[in-house]
Every structure is written in C-alpha cells, then in structure tokens.
Amino acid sequence: MFVHRLWTLAFPFLVEISKASQLENIKSLLDIEDNVLPNLNISQNNSNAVQILGGVDALSFYEYTGQQNFTKEIGPETSSHGLVYYSNNTYIQLEDASDDTRIDKITPFGVDSFILSGSGTINNISVGNQILYNLSTLSMTPIFNQSLGAVQAVLADNSSIYFGGNFSYNNGSMTGYSALIWDSISNTTQLLPFGGFGENSSVNSIVKLNNDNILFAGQFYTLDDPSALISSSNNGTNSTSSLNATTLELGQRIPLRYASWDSQGSTTFASDSLVCPNTNEDAWLYPDTSGSLVCNLPYEVSPTKIRLYNSQRSDSEISVFQILTDPSSSIMNLTYLDPLSGELKNCGEFCPLYSRATLLSASQNVSSSMDMITFIDNNKTDVKWTSDFQDFAFVNELPVSSLKFVALNSYGGSVGLSGLELYQDTFSTYANDSLNEYGCSALTNDSSSSTLSSNDWYNGLTGESYIAAKYVPDQNEPIPRVKFYPNIIHPGHYTINMYTPGCLQDNTCSARGIVNVTMWNQQNNTIMKTYLIYQNNDNLKYDQIYSGYLDFSPEIVLEYVSGIYTTNTATVVVADQVNVITVSLDAFNTLSDSSNAKKETLLNGILQYQKSNFTSTRLNETKVGNTTLNLFPVKNYPKNSSLYADIYDNKLVIGGVSNRISIVDLNDDFEVTSSKNQTIQGDVHGITKTNQGLLIFGDILSSNNQSAVFLFNGSFENVFNQSRTVNSALNISLANNDFIVLDNDYVVNASSNALIRNSSSFSLSLWAAGNNGDGDVLFSGAVSHMQYGNLNGSVRFLNENEIEPLNLEGGIVPYLGAYLNESATAYAYEVDSLNKIYFSNEVYPSWNWSSGITQMLYADNQTLLAVSAGSSTTAELSIFDLRNLTMIANETLGSNARINALVNFEKNCSMLVGGDFQMTEPNCTGLCLYNYESKTWSTFLNNTIFGEITQLSFTNSSELIISGLFETKEYQSIRLGSFNLTNSTMIPLLSGSEGKLNSFTVTEDSIVAWNDTSLFIYRNQEWNITSLPGNASSISSVSAIYTDIESNTLNKRGINNVNNGSILLLNGNFNISQYGYLQSLLFDFQKWTPYFISETTNTSNYNPIIFINRDVSTEFNSQSPLANVNITVTSPQSTSSQPPSSSASSESKSKSKKKKIGRGFVVLIGLALALGTVSVLGIAGVILAYVFKDPEGDYKPIKPRIDENEMLDTVPPEKLMKFV
C-alpha cells in the first residue's frame, strides 16, 4: 500500500518543483510563513528512540501557516466549492464559495492567470461572466458583462480566448450562438467572423491545430452566417441535381380553402381555382387597369412570402401591385429575385410583376436553375421565379388576419390573376383537420393531417384554430386523443413545437388538465420523445417537443392524462396545432445543375476554422471549405451528432455516438490521410487531456457491461470499470502523484489505475482544475493531504521531519512501550478486547489483561517487568520474571483504584506503587509498598505521604521526586516534591490548591512539570508558569529532546549540562487559531513551534503518545535499600538561622550564591540529575533550593506573551518570580 510521503509512487514526468512561479508571491500576499523546525538531533543512529504509539494512521509535519486547513478528512460538512492553490507540496485556500457556486472549468492563461467558468458567485462576482483570476495580485475580473450560461470549452490562443458551449451573445448587430472571442489586450468581446453555430447548437471542444487553424467540435450543422459555407466551383462539367431548384419549397403553403374573399366589382372570381392555380385559365379578372382583391383568413398566420401567377391573357396582365395587411393596416415591404438582372431587390408601394412572355424569355436565357432561386433569412425562405410565377418575400414577418392585393397598373386594359398562394416558413398541422386541407386534389399527398378520438370535440373561440373536449373519467367515454401527422417531404433538420391555447380567453383555467405528448417513429414504431404538458397556461404557449434530424413523417399523439385540480370532475382538453420549423435541408447538398453552381459546405459537429480565410481580400475566397476534416464526420457519423475532439501526437481523436471512437491521422496541412475506428459500446460524453494521454469517458460499457473510461496514448487502455455513466473526468497532479477524478466521486491513480478511496491520509473533492505548466495548480474543491499515510498505528522518527511505520510483526498496534535493552522493547497492545505484551525480539508471552495497561517498569538487574493495568473501576499489578516468562506476583487493588506510577527497590524486592486509590489493610492512600517476594503490602513511611500520586522518579538511588496532589504532616497541597530516602525528609517544590500536576520531566538544567493546560518550569533559580497557546488545548505528555549533536543523548541524559541544550516535545491536543488543531508542539523555553498534526486509526481505543525508547532504568529503579519504611516523614532543617524576610533578600542571596556555585548546582536537584553519582551532592542541591524558598512553597505565575496569535519569544527576567 501507499505509505511513505502518502505514496511511494513517483512518476518521471512529475518533477518536484523547487520554487513555483507564484508560490512565494502568494505567500507574501497572504502573510503565510514557513515553519522552520529546530534541529532535534533525531536520527537512525540513536536506535530510532523517538516513536509514536497508540494508533496513529496519518501524520504531517507542520511546514507553513494554513497547512491545517488541508489535514482533516473531507466530510459532508466540508466546503468544497472555493478555490485552492497548490505548488511544491503547499496548499493555500485562495477563495471560499457557497455550495450553490459551481466552477466547471479552470483554464490557464499566461504566466500568472487562470480563467474560471461555471455558475454562482465568488466574492459577489458572477462565475457565469467568466472570471480572470490573477495570481500575481490575487485579483478577480469579470470578462463579460453578461453570464454566458453553459461554457464547455475554453481555448487560450495567445491574447485571444475562445469560449464554446451552449449560449448566445448579441454584439448589437448580430446574435451569435455557442462561440465567442475575448481579446485580452483590448479587453473587447467579438463574435467569430461567421457569428456562431446557429440556434440549438453547442460547442463541446476547441482545439488549436496551429497558429492559423482552430478546430471546433460539438453539435451543429450550420453557421450563424451561412454564406460562409457557400463556395463557387467552376470545374467545366455539368452535374445533375438530385432535386431541382424549381421544385424545392422551404416553406409550407397556407391552406386557403376556408378563407373568405371580397372580390367586389370583379367580372370573374373562382376561389378554388385561385388557390389551386391552373396555368391555362384566370381565376380573378377585374375590368379596369387597377383593382383589388381581399382575402380574410380563417385564422391568424405569419406568412413569409406570396406567390403570384399573372393573368393568362396579355391584355389583363398586371404590371405593378402592392400588398396591404391587417391588423397592421400597412403596405408590406417585399423582397424578390429580379428575373432580368438576377439581383435580389426590394419594393413596397410599387412592386413589379412581369408578364408571362418576359418570364418565359428570362427562363430560357439562364445558365442554371440556380439562377432562378435565392435563399434569405438564414436559408429559411426561398425566393424564386419561373415562367409561370414570381415569389415576393415579406421583409417583416407579421401576424396577418386579412390580406389585400391591389393591382395598380396593367400591361393592357384590365387586371387579373390565375393564382395566388401564401407560404409560411413553418409546417402547421392542426387538430381540426379541415384546416389542413388545401382544397386542391393535386396537393392531397403533400398535406398534413390529423385524426381525433370519438369524443365530443367542439371548436374553440371564433377566429381561433383550436378545438376542445370535456372529459369525465370512468364514464365509459374514450380517452381524448389527437394524432398529428405532419408531412415531412424533404430530409433535414427540424424543430417541432406543440401549441396550447390560453385558458383566460375561454375561461377554462380551473378545468384544464395534463396531457401527454409522444412523438413516434412510424418506420420502426418506436418512441422518439415524450412529454407531460400542463394546459392551464393563461395565454397561448408552445412547448418544443423535438429538435433534430428527420427523413420521415412522424406521428405525434396528444392524449389526456389527468386533471390538475381535484375539485373538478370534468376536464377540458384542448388541441391546437403542431408546428414544424425547417432548420436545414439535405437538398442543399445537391442543389447544382451547372458548372457554375454554388455549393454549400456541409457540417456535422466539426469545423476547421482557418483564420486567414476570413482576413483575405481576394474575391470569391472560400471561407469554410469542404476540407477533408470538415467532411469526415459528415461521411462517418449520423447527422446532428454531438462530437468531442482533441489532439494526441498529431492524431485527432473524435468521439460521439454510433459506438465508435475515430483516430484520424493528419498531415501538415491538416488533411485526413487515414483513419481507423475503435469500436465501443455506447456514447462518448467527453475527452480530457491528461499527462498520460487523452481520457475518453461517457456512457461506455466494457466487455463485462460495466461503465468504462479509456485512456488513449497511441493505444487504448481501460482505466476504470464501475456500474455507472461517467459525465466528468479531470486530471490533477498533487504530491508527486497524478490523479484522475471521475464525477467528483472516484479518484484513480493514473499510473497504477488503482482506485483511491478517501481516508485520513488523503481525500479529494474536485470540480475543476487547471495547471499552467510552471508549477501553479489552481482547483475548485477540497483536499486533505497528510505527508505520511497508512502508518499502521505506530511510527519511528528517522530525523526531526521524517518518519516511517514501526511495522511490528503481525500488524500489532502498540499503545505503550518500555525499553528493555538495545535489542528488545516491550510493547502493550490490544487484540480481541484483550490487552497483551509483545517483545520486539518476536516473543509473544501468553499474559493478557481485560483492562488497558497503564504502566510498564523494567528492572534490568533482575530481568523483572512490572505491569499495571486498569479501568475506571479497578487496577491490577503484575510482576514477571523475563528469564523464563513466569509470573512472580499478581495483585488487584480495590474498586475505583488507578495505578499511575511505579518505582522499584531492588534490594528490598519491593515496588512502590503510586496512584489514586485507598487501601485499608495496610492503610495506604495513593502510595503503598508491595513486596513481590513475600507478596505483601505495607505502608510507605507510615502513610505519612498520602493523596493522589501521578508520577514517581529517582534522581539518584536515594532521591525520589513525586508529583500529583498530596500531603505530609507538615505540608498540604503538595503538587511536586523531592523526598530523600536516606533521612526521610520531604522538600515541597510546588504547592498550591490549583489542582494536581500530571507528571514531570527533568532536563540538564530544568525541571518541567505540567497539568492539562500549563507548564511549570524551574530554571535559572526560579519557577514560572507557561500556559499553552490557544484555547481548549491540553497536554498528554512532555518529553525532553536533547539537542547536543556531539553525543547520542537520546539514549541517556547528557553529562555536560553547560553545553547541552534541550527542547520540550509536547504531545496532546492543541487548538491554536493561527495553526489550527495540532497534536504536537515544541518549546525551547522561549518560543513555541508547531510540530505535527496526526490522525488516529478508526480501530484504536487509545490516543497517540510519544515514546522515547531509551534506557530509563535508573529513573525507576533504586539500588539503595530501604532502611526503615515505617518512620515518619520530616521536613529538612534550614541551614539559615532566620527565614528569608522578603523576595528582595532572597534574590540577593541567590545572586551571591550564584557567584560561588556553578549553574548546574543551582538548578533544583540538578547536580544529582546531571551527574547521577554522589547522593550527598544531590541532597545539597535540594537543601540549597529549599533554603531559598517560601515556607508554603507557593509560586506566582507570570503572564507570558502568548495568545492565539503569537508564540512566546522570551520571558523578561524582571517578570519572573523567584523560587524563594
């Protein structure tokens, strides 16, 4: 598994950066400081003496302020939508964001900036406006003045930034769809030269091919400026069109069978002939050179053009006319293709209508039928002429209820028409099938139709086209149903809308219901789309039910589902019309029947945009050509495909639908030279570029029918298998590892393809990420990263900032240790609710305890191991002979007892037991003597030392230091005392009613005691109290680390107490606002330094502790025999005839003494601790300290310069209270 520095994996392409381009700058801007650790002289040479036991699973040494924000495992409460910066193993939180903010894409730009795309806000700036985030200044600037919506692709091309997605942007003169350019130098926004990719399009990928060519991939088939797709060819050969221009109709003829006409004054009028033109006879004649004809439509329409057939008689042919409409009551502006000049012209009050002879002559002189037709309004309307008629397109598409045709002049003496037709650019199919009828037998096969269920349908309001039926369920009535059959004549792309009349006008809002609309493919009887539509809309509305390619006529079924309001028994179901809008037709692909035909470049989700084509000044320059790259998806993918693309090693990878991924080889001119397909099962939803290659993901199934994610780096490799579709894949490099994050749910190691699960050592939430290649990584999400993970419960230090797992045999997780000798250590551990001991020389004794082991003491001369165990209700003492692993003694103390400390008197075969207990036989309170040879208990000094004992330690064989909260006959509330075993005298070192001390340690020149929240330090002849920094901090243990680099001081106390220094290593839980939650601090008696943060294993019942694996036998074993354990403790006799009168006099005496005595002698019992040889000198040190102390042993704490925001730098000498 992954252990050292999170993982031992290292990839050759991931080189650790010594200094990121923006890291130091960001640190400076945010006042982030590096945490420099002192030299602790910890190395493997001192037998790995410093260890952490107790279930540690992950650990990070504190290296910089703010690191704590990235060490807690990610959970549901973690904020993961802000911005995080990473470089050189440093994480920095740059911005926070609420959960409704979503950054979907981060794109590097320049050497110091990134572009953020998404939704929501950061610092009140809309992410949808696209944000330029500058690392040099940590500033954010919105790029656009409006939200773009869904941005799916961003490409930085020098100073131009291309945005692609599903959005629209209006530059004041034109609306562009799905693409936009921002110029970073001029800070201006512009559409592409061709606008965009048309309505209902989307851009999924933008790929830079070279400085002149950019590839767009997505779902589109046209451009906002379709003229860019038109090119002229003159190859000297004729080709035959599959569809002649004269037969192509983009719009639908509006049925006029039920229109009413006003032909007052006419000599001839036949409406049936007028709307169904017969080129051999006139349908309307008026006996003057001017006249009018009015058509009142059965319902309101928005016509796009009118087609006029001039009179068959030369004397009645109209030469000039105009069109007026209601309700606008205005003359309509018209556009027509002039048969004589071939130009597109406009007219209004006076529009020319050519004679049949003129049209016939013009038609005989054209070189191609394409000269008789043109397309306007983005190819939605065709305007043409033939020898029989002329088309006039309405410049303004307005609603029309009545149309008046006015003949203003004639080529002869009267005016007349043989035909009049209206067209609209939509195909309407009405529920009232009579409105679908043209009334012309020749057009029967071209008309749309509908059928109704056998309910009582009735017409809606007068002048409206809808019908309605009242329906009461469970009354043996058929379910109201309407089937629409829109007639699709030409294959192409269409949009279909279902119209629903409003309920306010007919006052049926409270009775309206819910209908289901289903679109069927009649060729294979499959459902294409289905929707629920609520019909209680106040006004006329439409719902889009389809947009895409059709080469057949579908069936659309509207059917009652339920009422909306439970109070109504009857539901009014309404049905109006299905509206089909032509987007583009395949017929455009083949419209050519001459050598000079204009050809349209076909698109299907891929566009090769060559910038120079749009800047060239040459006439007839092709803007978008039929390049092999543009034509590749046209020939190889279904129409209207949604495609994704990217480049790897000069190979273009294309994915989308149709169960394949295409690998396209390109030459230097980006021409397709070859291609091959990788067969897959499913559709591609995206392609992401990673350090290893291209990641291809989507609804792709592997051979075992699980979702697959492929990596392409010249060949295909499956990197993920799960039972779900993958909609997002991101790549990020952190901590010398490369990760792939799928749907912000799965994290995959990119080298091994191993799935990484969130843990205490590493967890990641990732919405978007960007890397500028200079070592700056910016991502939206959250991360928890501990330097060392999977530590298996215990570690040893290799140096002051490097560790490795202890890895004891059998996966043992120890929580307590005891040094035996240079080759063996005893460890306490728990397994199956039993507590046991393991020896590191792989010896497993059979002993076990039901309660946790609290103390272990080893006597080397006797090879004896004393073990105390206990719970909240009982305590147990066990003593073993390690020569044969036999138990010497086993004792259980009474209820509510706890053993805290043990020291051994070898000569007496007795163990002095300290703790929190009460014994009656013998009478012991907190301190009792146990003879493990006779297996008997006895009082220690007639129980004249009593209370709660927390720690016992010899300074030499006859000096015993005791901590806790205890009393003697002379002193009360002793918290720390020194007891002389030779003369049975007690010297209180610290007294007071503030509570017990938990323990103490002794350095070369200091005594350090502590309770939960403070250190009590005797140094330089004075005591002071140093409170822990921060709030709610607590100490578990304090260890002295000796920093003398000349001696192996971890194995034994230093001898030269002048040159040797020491640093206190605190273990516990420390909450400091500047550093967060820590588990270890360092204190050099002047300032605090954060040391490490750790996490425990889920299975451990113990808190991690620091274990110094060194020989401490002299601290807990005495070679001096106890002369008389039943004498009474006394106080020492003062060497001064008078007690000190004041602090001032005490200070004066101290200074005079200091001139005569070396520093090591002045420290309380320091000589005995440093030399450990002559007990008399130890006694002298204690007495010396006692002479200059207050009778009550009180102390006054200083107020250290420590708060939550700073560490203690130094303690002013004038503020220190003398130990006098």
From Swiss-Prot:
Glycosylated. Residues 21-1162 are extracellular. Residues 1131-1147 have a biased composition (Low complexity). It is found in: Cell membrane; Bud neck; Bud tip. Residues 1184-1220 are cytoplasmic. Keywords: Cell cycle, Cell division, Cell membrane, Glycoprotein, Membrane, Signal, Transmembrane, Transmembrane helix. Residues 1129-1151 are annotated as: Disordered. Glycans are attached at residues 41, 45, 69, 88, 124, 134, 145, 158, 166, 171, 187, 200, 235, 238, 244, 333, 365, 379, 432, 445, 516, 524, 613, 620, 626, 640, 677, 705, 713, 721, 731, 749, 758, 792, 821, 848, 861, 884, 890, 908, 923, 942, 956, 980, 983, 1011, 1024, 1031, 1060, 1071, 1098, 1126. One of its GO terms (biological process) is protein localization. It is a single-pass type I membrane protein. The chain crosses the membrane at residues 1163-1183. The keyword Cell division applies. It comes from the Eukaryota. GO terms for cellular component: cellular bud neck; cellular bud scar; cellular bud tip; endoplasmic reticulum; mitochondrion; plasma membrane of growing cell tip. Belongs to the RAX2 family. Present with 3670 molecules/cell in log phase SD medium. This is Bud site selection protein RAX2.
